[in-house]
Protein backbone atom coordinates (compact mmCIF):
# COMPACT_ATOMS: atom_id res chain seq x y z
CA UNK A 1 0.00 0.00 0.00
CA UNK A 2 0.84 3.65 -0.10
CA UNK A 3 3.47 4.96 2.30
CA UNK A 4 3.00 8.68 1.54
CA UNK A 5 0.18 11.06 0.68
CA UNK A 6 0.58 14.30 -1.26
CA UNK A 7 -1.77 17.17 -0.46
CA UNK A 8 -1.64 19.85 -3.16
CA UNK A 9 -3.60 22.99 -3.92
CA UNK A 10 -3.85 25.23 -6.98
CA UNK A 11 -2.95 28.88 -6.37
CA UNK A 12 -6.06 31.08 -6.72
CA UNK A 13 -7.74 28.48 -8.91
CA UNK A 14 -10.77 30.33 -10.32
CA UNK A 15 -9.07 33.73 -10.71
CA UNK A 16 -6.11 32.09 -12.49
CA UNK A 17 -8.02 30.08 -15.11
CA UNK A 18 -7.21 31.64 -18.47
CA UNK A 19 -10.35 31.59 -20.63
CA UNK A 20 -8.46 30.38 -23.71
CA UNK A 21 -7.50 27.27 -21.72
CA UNK A 22 -11.13 26.10 -21.98
CA UNK A 23 -10.60 25.48 -25.68
CA UNK A 24 -7.15 24.00 -25.01
CA UNK A 25 -8.72 21.47 -22.64
CA UNK A 26 -11.44 20.50 -25.11
CA UNK A 27 -9.56 20.57 -28.43
CA UNK A 28 -5.83 20.48 -27.58
CA UNK A 29 -3.72 23.59 -27.30
CA UNK A 30 -2.14 23.50 -30.77
CA UNK A 31 -5.47 23.01 -32.58
CA UNK A 32 -7.12 25.73 -30.49
CA UNK A 33 -4.36 28.25 -31.16
CA UNK A 34 -4.52 27.59 -34.93
CA UNK A 35 -8.31 28.03 -34.93
CA UNK A 36 -8.81 30.53 -32.11
CA UNK A 37 -11.46 32.58 -34.00
CA UNK A 38 -13.45 29.56 -35.21
CA UNK A 39 -16.62 29.54 -33.08
CA UNK A 40 -17.62 26.13 -34.48
CA UNK A 41 -15.11 24.79 -31.94
CA UNK A 42 -17.37 24.85 -28.90
CA UNK A 43 -14.33 25.46 -26.68
CA UNK A 44 -13.83 28.78 -28.47
CA UNK A 45 -17.52 29.59 -28.02
CA UNK A 46 -17.29 28.86 -24.28
CA UNK A 47 -14.12 30.96 -24.14
CA UNK A 48 -15.90 33.90 -25.79
CA UNK A 49 -18.97 33.58 -23.51
CA UNK A 50 -16.75 33.41 -20.42
CA UNK A 51 -14.86 36.52 -21.54
CA UNK A 52 -18.15 38.36 -22.08
CA UNK A 53 -19.17 37.64 -18.47
CA UNK A 54 -16.05 39.56 -17.36
CA UNK A 55 -16.01 42.52 -19.76
CA UNK A 56 -13.91 40.57 -22.29
CA UNK A 57 -11.15 39.77 -19.81
CA UNK A 58 -9.33 36.53 -20.54
CA UNK A 59 -7.89 35.93 -17.09
CA UNK A 60 -10.02 34.39 -14.39
CA UNK A 61 -13.44 32.92 -13.84
CA UNK A 62 -16.08 34.58 -11.71
CA UNK A 63 -16.37 32.98 -8.29
CA UNK A 64 -19.90 31.88 -7.48
CA UNK A 65 -21.80 31.07 -10.70
CA UNK A 66 -22.39 27.39 -11.39
CA UNK A 67 -21.06 27.97 -14.89
CA UNK A 68 -17.65 28.73 -13.36
CA UNK A 69 -17.70 25.38 -11.56
CA UNK A 70 -18.48 23.58 -14.82
CA UNK A 71 -15.81 25.46 -16.77
CA UNK A 72 -13.18 24.85 -14.09
CA UNK A 73 -14.05 21.14 -14.21
CA UNK A 74 -13.47 21.11 -17.98
CA UNK A 75 -9.95 22.49 -17.51
CA UNK A 76 -9.08 20.50 -14.38
CA UNK A 77 -10.45 17.23 -15.79
CA UNK A 78 -8.10 17.68 -18.74
CA UNK A 79 -5.21 18.02 -16.27
CA UNK A 80 -6.44 14.93 -14.39
CA UNK A 81 -6.52 12.99 -17.65
CA UNK A 82 -2.93 13.91 -18.47
CA UNK A 83 -1.74 13.04 -14.96
CA UNK A 84 -3.44 9.64 -15.06
CA UNK A 85 -3.00 8.57 -18.67
CA UNK A 86 0.17 10.32 -19.82
CA UNK A 87 2.15 10.66 -16.58
CA UNK A 88 0.73 7.37 -15.19
CA UNK A 89 -0.29 8.71 -11.76
CA UNK A 90 -3.31 6.54 -10.98
CA UNK A 91 -3.97 7.10 -7.27
CA UNK A 92 -5.31 10.66 -7.56
CA UNK A 93 -8.32 12.25 -5.92
CA UNK A 94 -9.31 15.82 -6.64
CA UNK A 95 -11.95 17.97 -4.99
CA UNK A 96 -12.31 21.24 -6.90
CA UNK A 97 -8.70 22.53 -6.70
CA UNK A 98 -7.38 20.27 -3.92
CA UNK A 99 -5.39 17.23 -5.03
CA UNK A 100 -4.64 14.12 -2.97
CA UNK A 101 -2.20 11.56 -4.34
CA UNK A 102 -1.10 8.30 -2.70
CA UNK A 103 2.50 7.24 -3.35
CA UNK A 104 4.48 4.12 -2.54
CA UNK A 105 7.76 6.05 -2.21
CA UNK A 106 8.86 9.58 -1.37
CA UNK A 107 10.40 9.86 -4.86
CA UNK A 108 7.06 8.96 -6.43
CA UNK A 109 5.37 11.66 -4.33
CA UNK A 110 7.95 14.24 -5.44
CA UNK A 111 7.53 13.16 -9.07
CA UNK A 112 3.76 13.66 -8.80
CA UNK A 113 4.24 17.21 -7.47
CA UNK A 114 6.65 17.97 -10.32
CA UNK A 115 4.28 16.51 -12.95
CA UNK A 116 1.25 18.30 -11.48
CA UNK A 117 3.16 21.58 -11.57
CA UNK A 118 4.11 20.99 -15.22
CA UNK A 119 0.52 20.15 -16.19
CA UNK A 120 -0.77 23.26 -14.43
CA UNK A 121 1.81 25.47 -16.17
CA UNK A 122 0.52 24.17 -19.53
CA UNK A 123 -2.76 25.88 -18.59
CA UNK A 124 -0.97 28.93 -17.11
CA UNK A 125 -1.80 27.90 -13.55
CA UNK A 126 0.47 27.05 -10.62
CA UNK A 127 0.72 25.05 -7.42
CA UNK A 128 0.32 26.77 -4.08
CA UNK A 129 3.66 25.83 -2.50
CA UNK A 130 2.43 26.85 0.96
CA UNK A 131 -0.36 24.27 0.81
CA UNK A 132 1.51 21.50 -1.02
CA UNK A 133 3.11 18.87 1.19
CA UNK A 134 4.12 15.22 1.42
CA UNK A 135 2.92 13.37 4.52
CA UNK A 136 3.98 9.96 5.73
CA UNK A 137 1.27 7.34 6.18
CA UNK A 138 -0.51 6.11 8.20
CA UNK A 139 -2.19 9.37 9.23
CA UNK A 140 -4.89 9.83 11.85
CA UNK A 141 -8.36 9.77 10.32
CA UNK A 142 -9.00 13.24 11.76
CA UNK A 143 -6.75 16.22 12.35
CA UNK A 144 -5.44 16.60 15.91
CA UNK A 145 -7.49 19.74 16.50
CA UNK A 146 -10.70 17.92 15.59
CA UNK A 147 -9.90 15.18 18.09
CA UNK A 148 -9.06 17.72 20.81
CA UNK A 149 -12.27 19.71 20.32
CA UNK A 150 -14.45 16.59 20.13
CA UNK A 151 -12.89 15.23 23.33
CA UNK A 152 -13.59 18.42 25.29
CA UNK A 153 -15.69 17.49 28.31
CA UNK A 154 -18.88 19.48 28.65
CA UNK A 155 -20.94 18.92 31.84
CA UNK A 156 -23.25 15.93 31.52
CA UNK A 157 -26.07 17.68 33.40
CA UNK A 158 -26.46 20.21 30.56
CA UNK A 159 -25.53 23.15 32.81
CA UNK A 160 -22.87 25.01 30.84
CA UNK A 161 -21.20 27.94 32.56
CA UNK A 162 -19.35 30.92 31.13
CA UNK A 163 -16.15 29.34 32.44
CA UNK A 164 -16.81 26.15 30.45
CA UNK A 165 -17.47 28.11 27.26
CA UNK A 166 -14.33 30.20 27.79
CA UNK A 167 -12.24 27.04 28.31
CA UNK A 168 -13.66 25.50 25.13
CA UNK A 169 -13.01 28.65 23.07
CA UNK A 170 -9.50 28.96 24.55
CA UNK A 171 -8.83 25.39 23.41
CA UNK A 172 -10.22 26.21 19.94
CA UNK A 173 -8.05 29.34 19.74
CA UNK A 174 -4.97 27.35 20.78
CA UNK A 175 -5.77 24.70 18.15
CA UNK A 176 -6.14 27.46 15.52
CA UNK A 177 -2.75 28.90 16.43
CA UNK A 178 -1.06 25.48 16.27
CA UNK A 179 -2.78 24.57 12.98
CA UNK A 180 -2.00 27.99 11.49
CA UNK A 181 -5.57 28.43 10.28
CA UNK A 182 -8.93 29.60 11.61
CA UNK A 183 -10.76 26.35 10.84
CA UNK A 184 -10.64 25.00 14.44
CA UNK A 185 -12.12 28.22 15.82
CA UNK A 186 -14.84 28.26 13.13
CA UNK A 187 -15.59 24.60 13.90
CA UNK A 188 -15.95 25.38 17.62
CA UNK A 189 -18.29 28.31 17.05
Where are these regions (language model features)?
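Conserved polymerase palm-domain catalytic core
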Residues: 1-96, 102-115, 158-189
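Polymerase palm active-site segment centered on the conserved acidic dipeptide of motif C
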Residues: 106-167, 171-174
Amino acid sequence: GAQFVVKADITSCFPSIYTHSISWALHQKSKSKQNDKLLELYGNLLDKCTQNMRDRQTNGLMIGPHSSNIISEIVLTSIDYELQNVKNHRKIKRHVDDYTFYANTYDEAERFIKDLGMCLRTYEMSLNDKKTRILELPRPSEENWTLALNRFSFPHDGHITFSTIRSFLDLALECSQIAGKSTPLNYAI
